Curated annotation (Swiss-Prot):
Its main location: plastid. The lineage of its organism: Eukaryota, Viridiplantae, Streptophyta, Embryophyta, Tracheophyta. NADP(+) binds at I568, K600, T649, K673, G758, E761, G893. Keywords: Amino-acid biosynthesis, ATP-binding, Chloroplast, Kinase, Lysine biosynthesis, Metal-binding, Methionine biosynthesis, Multifunctional enzyme, NAD, NADP, Nucleotide-binding, Oxidoreductase, Plastid, Repeat, Sodium, Threonine biosynthesis, Transferase, Transit peptide. It catalyses: L-homoserine + NADP(+) = L-aspartate 4-semialdehyde + NADPH + H(+); L-homoserine + NAD(+) = L-aspartate 4-semialdehyde + NADH + H(+); L-aspartate + ATP = 4-phospho-L-aspartate + ADP. It comes from the Eukaryota. Residues 337-562 are annotated as: Interface. This is Bifunctional aspartokinase/homoserine dehydrogenase 2, chloroplastic. Bifunctional aspartate kinase and homoserine dehydrogenase that catalyzes the first and the third steps toward the synthesis of lysine, methionine and threonine from aspartate. L-homoserine binds at E761, D772. Na(+) binds at E700, V703, A705, L707. Its EC number is 2.7.2.4, 1.1.1.3. It comes from Arabidopsis thaliana.
Length: 916
């Protein structure tokens, strides 16, 4: 503090500067010409010598010369003090929802306090809905609606209640005094508007900007209550903008910087609460920064201060890759370049207004989008990443997608356009003359046509202007048509890496094609920051989901439908539940079950069924089963890159759907043997489709449950080996029966035991007939290249002929012991020869035939060594001729069968790009 007496002269010795405070060197000023300045915060105090004048000088470095002060509070300073600039500043902007009520204002104050930056400038919007309320006041007054008075009272009450909840004592009295004074002035102004029936733009801007004044004042009081020094800034005193012809404003950075220095010299503080949205013209007329003006205010202030960063606080966790209201899978983007953010903003993404980015780009100041209601979310950083940024190289080439709806496409076409200078100028001159805005332009390289998109509300004026301007060309035939295509939308794909990544456009258009979406027009600049397409408005959401899924969902994200939630299907669902998190985290395999259907009820979901509750949900919320709706849900109602139906039934009707599913691009996985062992012509048609398409059909579990029988056979064939013979025990039930048909036990006794243990089908005749084994033989034969049908196989049935006509399972089981003698004799004969009986299927590839029969094997033969329900398959090939290749293991049971199906699902994922 300096103390000056009247007629007292202060002279710096040797012209050295007087040092006040300890600001950084960049704030140290030496200006040769003295300037006259009224010092801030003078106050008189009592004391000897006729009264002292105390001058509290702000914390600056000054170069000063002093003059005599004779009873006046003036002194000659070398120059006006400049505000310090640089990374010591952080700028925050809080939108209307952030200061929507008293508690939220407290939350904002807490964020400010917890920011460890040396200096902070905070830009605030009006409280939520207040700006709309202010403009509504103006509209009502202009239309001479007396309710403007009650509406003004509502504005007053909203702020009065908020202030009373936040403030007390002198702070409350001071704020309410300012508030009531402002309301009184507004009432007079609105009365004038009411009488005139009109309000000028500057008049309206002045009225509308009061919400920011009140919220900034309240917040500054709240921050000061915590003990921190804080000043509030009316940015109309600082920000100077020039109106443009497009009803926008351009900042005058030079003049604004001067006024900021002047303001700071009078109001030094390390925390400044500034009004957003409002500014002044060079003539000091109040104005606004128009749409998203508070964001723009923060960006301008950040640039003026050369701040470390500008944080935009809002009510979302950051910038999404697409509108989350339209795309469930939209993700928060960690980083965006300035160009990417600008492009996404231009094309309608709710990020920032494009002009907000311009001021900070000048000084490479990052913008951070944060959620005031979720402080743990890191948000999105908008900055210019280094060209060699490793993380950037690993990201998808497309950062995000945005759409603009309610557009119309105008196509100007004609052979007379080619090579004629000025045609494009004339076209877009017409657009300018009617005040329309061109959103996108596309021109054929032949110059035969130009098409462009404009807002639909402006298309009639534009088309009429064009037809008037080119009427002679239309009559002469130089132009063939001026066509208007209404009800359009623009879809833009944005990404800085698109410029260096081949195939992005191919991927984009293939995704649209798969979704059956037609593209009306295409535009891409040479910078390749965006690819823009025009589509039907009705296809806008569908297209957005399609392209987003193609770029942002892993190629190993599978939309799954499970048919048959019986024993096998239920076990599979439980296995998926237990393993899903591990697969997603460690292998990037995202399995989403969108449908479960039985014969009577089905359960569908758009985002994925909760597999921890699928039984409960199916029972409580299941609807009537409908395979067409089920298929549509799994494949047609979303844009997950891949769809797969898993058929866990033994139903021929379900198997008959495979061809249609594969043709639609749905992968099929199944243990159901009916399709591969059915009529040969249908099987060949199915396999032909599979070979010609890129859709996969896996059926490992049809033969060996969880054993790798099919994959082993294919591996032999694909590596050039030749199959001579396949022989095996491939029925877990019949393996169990003959492994236990020993000693004095009767065959019927073993069958009864197996049935009671759940090893057989509900009707054991389904196992004993040999049909199941025969189907497996047919599958193996066809895999080996043999064209066999079930009718071509001799099958040894273990069902006694007289019992085939039994009308019930009970009757069959009751009469079965009567026929134990024949099998007992065969077993005894085998034992007398040192052999055992085994029920086997045989593929004789050399002689092009197959059989299902009861055979005898030496006790040292691998087939005689089985136990329980194990299966065993022996492959005799040109490579494995003397010693067959043997695959052995459990061949029955819900767990191993479901495991075999699960293995096929993971195999499909690996084919689609999952890491090995």
């Amino acid at each position: 503090m300096a103390t000056l007496k009247p007629s007292f002269t202060v002279s710096p010795p040797n012209s050295n500067p007087i040092r006040f405070g300890s600001f950084p060197p960049q704030c140290f000023l030496r200006v040769p010409k003295p300037r006259r300045l009224i010092l801030p915060r003078f106050r008189k105090t009592t004391g000897g010598g006729g009264g002292l004048i105390r001058c509290e000088l702000p914390d600056f470095h000054l170069s000063a010369t002093a003059t005599t002060v004779s009873g006046v509070s003036t002194v000659n300073l070398v120059d006006q003090v400049q505000i310090p600039k640089g990374e010591m500043w952080s700028v925050h902007k809080f939108g209307g929802t952030c200061v929507g009520n008293s508690q939220r204002i407290r939350n904002v104050a807490e964020v400010i306090i917890n920011d460890n930056s040396e200096r902070k400038l905070v830009v605030v919007s009006a409280m939520s809905k207040v700006t709309d309320m202010m403009y509504d006041l103006i509209r009502k007054a202009q239309s001479r609606d007396d309710s403007y008075l009650s509406a003004l009272e509502a504005v007053l009450e909203k702020h009065r209640l908020t202030a009373r909840d936040l403030l007390d004592g002198d702070d409350l009295a001071s704020f309410l005094s300012h508030l009531h004074n402002d309301i009184s002035n507004l009432k007079a102004m609105l009365r004038a508007i009411y009488i005139a029936g009109h309000a000028s733009e500057s008049f309206s801007d002045f009225v509308a900007g009061h919400g920011e004044l009140w919220s900034a004042q309240m917040l500054s009081y709240v921050v000061r209550k915590t003990g921190l020094e804080c000043k509030w800034m009316d940015t109309r005193d600082v920000l100077i903008v020039n109106p443009t012809s497009s009803n926008q404003v351009d900042p005058d950075f030079g003049e604004s910087e001067k006024r900021l220095d002047k303001w700071f010299s009078l109001n030094p503080s390390k925390i400044i609460i500034a009004t957003g949205f409002i500014a002044s013209t060079p003539q000091n007329i109040p104005t606004t920064l128009k749409r998203d003006g508070s964001d723009f205010s923060a960006a301008i202030m950040g640039a003026l201060l050369r701040a470390r960063q500008v944080t935009i606080w809002t009510d979302v966790d950051g910038v999404y890759s697409a509108d989350p209201r339209k795309v469930n899978e939209a993700v928060i983007l960690q980083t965006l370049s300035y160009q990417e953010a600008w492009e996404m903003s231009y094309f309608g993404a709710n990020v920032l207004h494009p002009r907000t980015i311009i001021p900070v780009m000048r000084y490479n100041i990052p913008i951070v989008i944060r959620n005031i209601f979720n402080l743990s979310a890191p948000g999105t950083i908008i900055c210019q990443p280094p060209e060699d940024d490793y993380d950037l190289k690993l990201t998808t080439p497309v950062k995000g997608f945005a759409t603009i709806d309610n557009l119309a496409l105008i196509n100007v076409e004609g052979t007379g356009m080619a090579g004629v200078p000025g045609t494009a100028s004339d076209i877009f001159g017409c657009v300018k003359d009617v005040g329309a805005n061109v959103i996108m332009i596309s021109q054929a390289s032949s110059e035969h046509s130009v098409c462009f998109a404009v807002p639909e509300k402006e298309v009639n004026a534009v088309s009429e202007a064009l037809r008037s301007r080119f009427s002679e060309a239309l009559q002469a035939g130089r132009l063939s048509q001026i066509e208007v295509i209404p009800n359009c939308s623009i879809l833009a794909a944005v990404g800085q890496k698109m410029a260096s990544t081949p195939g992005v456009s191919c991927t984009l258009f293939s995704a649209l094609a798969k979704a059956n979406i037609n593209v009306r027009a295409i535009s891409q600049g040479c910078s390749e920051y965006n690819v823009t397409v025009v589509i039907k408005r009705e296809d806008s959401v569908k297209a957005l989901r399609a392209v987003h899924s193609r770029f942002f969902l892993s190629r190993t994200t599978l939309a799954m439908g499970i048919v048959g939630p019986g024993l096998i299907g239920a076990t599979l669902l439980d296995q998926l539940r237990d393993q899903a998190a591990v697969l997603k985290q460690e292998f990037n395999i995202d399995l989403r079950v969108l449908g479960i259907t039985g014969s009577k009820k089905m359960l569908l979901s758009d985002i994925g069924i909760d597999l921890s509750r699928w039984r409960e949900l199916l029972n409580e919320k299941g609807t009537e089963a409908d395979l067409d709706k089920f298929t549509q849900q799994v494949h047609g109602n979303h844009f997950i890159p891949n769809s797969v139906v898993v058929d866990c039934t033994a139903d021929s009707a379900i198997a008959s759907r495979y061809y249609d599913w594969l043709r639609k691009g749905i992968h099929v996985i199944t243990p159901n043997k009916k399709a591969n062992s059915g009529p040969l012509d249908q099987y060949l048609k199915l396999r032909d489709l599979q070979r010609k398409s890129y859709t996969h059909y896996f059926y490992e579990a049809t033969v060996g449950a969880g054993l790798p029988i099919i994959s082993t056979l294919r591996g032999l064939l694909e590596t050039g080996d030749k199959i001579l013979r396949i022989e095996g025990i491939c029925s877990g039930t019949l393996s169990y029966l003959f492994n236990n048909f020993v000693g004095d036990r009767s065959f019927s006794e073993v069958v009864t035991e197996a049935k009671n243990a759940g090893f057989t089908e509900p009707d054991p005749r389904d196992d004993l007939s040999g049909t199941d084994v025969a189907r497996k033989v047919i599958i193996l034969a066809r895999e080996s290249g043999l064209k066999l049908d079930l009718a071509d196989l001799p099958i040894r049935s273990l069902v006694p002929e007289p019992l085939k006509g039994c009308t019930s399972v009970e009757e069959f089981m009751e009469k079965l012991p009567q026929y134990d003698g024949d099998l007992a004799k065969e077993r005894l004969d085998a034992e007398n020869s040192g052999e055992v009986l085994r029920y086997v299927g045989v593929v004789d590839a050399v002689n092009q035939k197959g059989t299902v029969e009861l055979r005898r094997y030496k006790k040292e033969h691998p087939f005689a060594q089985l136990a329980g329900s194990d299966n065993i398959i022996a492959f005799t090939t040109t490579r494995y001729k003397d010693h067959p290749l043997i695959v052995r293991g459990p061949g029955a049971g819900a767990q191993v069968t479901a495991g075999g199906i699960f293995s096929d699902i993971l195999r499909l994922a690996s084919y689609l790009g999952a890491p090995s």
